[in-house]
């Protein structure tokens, strides 16, 4: 029998700011990731879920080279990257990790607003102080992800947004479905008396 144990971690990366403390915060974030990778054993199935506050992009199926260059990404992520996303993508590639949420198409409409899991609701002032000068950004981004190791990716059945959400939040709920056991059916060896009786009863 295959021995499997799960190492599940929650992650939150600091949002990109011009504050001087951001450099220290993001360095601490990656140091914690390094420690987590070091704690992992061969038997561990590592699952990291959280808000990474980074646009990592997607492997466009038209650009085949991108699939080879960035194996950490699938073809169902949102296009567009930023500096934080490029750094995170390169880190995941170096550690042989996979952003599972970019490999699966949602069961409903697969347009960018559906793939996205965060909508910017911040108010932007265009100028002046009248109410008409304040607008909602309204842009959608894919910031929340589930990350797994490449060796365990075959266990993942689905990772992505859910169809319905019962809570009010600017973040869309995402889920990960994983295969734990291939076959739990008990094998009858013919030695158990109760099993033999049940087998005869079923034949009758």
In which residue ranges do the predicted regions lie?
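Metal-dependent phosphoesterases centered on the DNase I-like endonuclease/exonuclease/phosphatase
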Residues: 28-151
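Active-site-proximal loop/helix segment associated with metal-binding centers of metalloenzymes
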Residues: 8-15, 70-75, 202-204
């Amino acid at each position: 029998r295959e021995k499997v144990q799960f190492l599940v971690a929650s992650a939150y990366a600091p949002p990109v700011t011009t504050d001087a403390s951001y450099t220290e915060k993001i360095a601490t974030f990656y140091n914690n990731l390094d420690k987590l990778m070091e704690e992992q054993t061969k038997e561990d199935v590592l699952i990291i879920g959280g808000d990474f506050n980074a646009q990592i992009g997607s492997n466009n199926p038209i650009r085949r080279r991108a699939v080879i260059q960035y194996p950490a990404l699938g073809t169902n992520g949102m296009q567009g990257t930023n500096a934080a996303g490029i750094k995170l993508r390169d880190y995941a590639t170096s550690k042989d990790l996979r952003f599972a949420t970019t490999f699966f198409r949602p069961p409903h409409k697969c347009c960018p607003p559906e793939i996205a899991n965060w909508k910017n609701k911040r108010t932007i002032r265009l100028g002046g102080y009248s109410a008409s000068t304040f607008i909602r950004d309204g842009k959608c981004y894919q910031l929340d992800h589930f990350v797994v190791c490449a060796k365990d990716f075959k266990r993942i059945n689905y990772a992505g947004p859910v169809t319905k959400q019962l809570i009010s939040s600017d973040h869309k709920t995402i889920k990960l479905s994983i295969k734990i056991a291939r076959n739990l059916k008990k094998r009858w060896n013919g030695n158990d008396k109760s099993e033999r009786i049940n087998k005869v009863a079923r034949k009758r």
